[in-house]
């Protein structure tokens, strides 16, 4: 259905003037076909969602154990070695390992201080004052989970505490509004509105994404103000992973490893991520660890 088509409710008005952006009242199978043809978005079945939830819970558990192991003096390579052990323990595959071009060389991303995302583990020990995002993505029984969290090492400067808190609030604010019918752009609006209250910037080079059957699927989820009017619908599963900078929003990708993105002004950056499912009445955070 396009915006200028007659509204599905039978009012005779255009969809954009009537029930837009609410999706048509269809059977689950018809709605799934509509989203596949109109937006190239795969709405997950309850059976698929259950498998994705299992993958997300294992992903969240691995992330939790890695965060607990992140202490002063530990290297991120040691965290990657622990990650390999945990993936074996939970019968999971590390989705980032050898992903992309050039192939990503590790099983997790560890992004410290001014590194926005895709940090590659190395032999440098963690030290007092570091902040670090650990990003874990797992494949379990062929289904994907994806989440990340910030860790603070020892005594951390106030500005770093502030950027970690701001990024978490950006994520939480954007999740709180989720329900069927709202346009995708409201996610970015919520994130940028919260970042504005801190005077921080929102990275626009990297976005959230559909996930579950593949590592990266439609829809792509901008974390900044945008005009995407795709209405959320039950069965959509995607990540929200806002990257928030103290200074300028621009990032620079390392020309040597072609993965690590750093802030252009070397100011700190922070990111938190969850995988979320849209339900009939709202949302479910699939990577919220259920003990």
Swiss-Prot record:
GO terms for biological process: proteolysis. The keyword Metal-binding applies. CDD domains: MetAP1. Keywords: Aminopeptidase, Hydrolase, Metal-binding, Protease. One of its GO terms (molecular function) is initiator methionyl aminopeptidase activity. Binds 2 divalent metal cations per subunit. Has a high-affinity and a low affinity metal-binding site. The true nature of the physiological cofactor is under debate. The enzyme is active with cobalt, zinc, manganese or divalent iron ions. Most likely, methionine aminopeptidases function as mononuclear Fe(2+)-metalloproteases under physiological conditions, and the catalytically relevant metal-binding site has been assigned to the histidine-containing high-affinity site. PANTHER family: METHIONINE AMINOPEPTIDASE (PTHR43330:SF27). Monomer. This is Methionine aminopeptidase. It comes from Chlamydia pneumoniae.
């Amino acid at each position: 259905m396009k915006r200028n088509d007659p509204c599905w409710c039978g009012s005779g008005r255009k969809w954009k003037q009537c029930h837009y952006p609410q999706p048509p009242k269809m059977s689950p199978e018809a709605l799934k076909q509509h989203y596949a043809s109109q937006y190239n978005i795969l709405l997950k079945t309850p059976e698929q969602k259950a498998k994705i939830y299992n993958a997300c819970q294992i992903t969240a558990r691995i992330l939790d154990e890695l965060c607990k192991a992140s202490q002063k003096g530990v290297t991120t390579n040691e965290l990657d070695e622990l990650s390999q052990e945990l993936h074996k323990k939970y019968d999971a595959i590390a989705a980032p390992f050898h992903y992309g071009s050039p192939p990503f060389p590790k099983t997790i991303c560890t992004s410290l201080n001014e590194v926005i995302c895709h940090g590659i583990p190395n032999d440098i020990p963690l030290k007092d004052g570091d902040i670090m995002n650990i990003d874990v993505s797992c494949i379990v029984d062929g289904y994907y989970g994806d989440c990340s969290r910030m860790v603070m090492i020892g005594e951390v400067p106030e500005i770093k505490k502030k950027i970690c808190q701001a990024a978490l609030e950006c994520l939480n604010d954007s999740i709180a509004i989720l329900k069927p019918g709202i346009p995708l752009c409201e996610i970015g609006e919520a994130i940028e509105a919260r970042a504005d209250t801190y005077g921080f910037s929102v990275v626009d080079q990297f976005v959230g994404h559909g996930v579950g059957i593949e590592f990266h699927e439609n829809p792509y989820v901008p974390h900044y103000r945008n005009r995407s009017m795709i209405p959320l619908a039950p069965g959509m599963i995607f990540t929200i992973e806002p990257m928030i900078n103290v200074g300028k929003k621009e990032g620079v990708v390392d020309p040597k490893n072609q993965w690590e993105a750093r802030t252009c002004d070397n100011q700190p950056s922070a990111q938190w991520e969850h995988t979320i499912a849209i339900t009939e009445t709202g949302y479910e955070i699939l990577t919220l660890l259920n003990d």
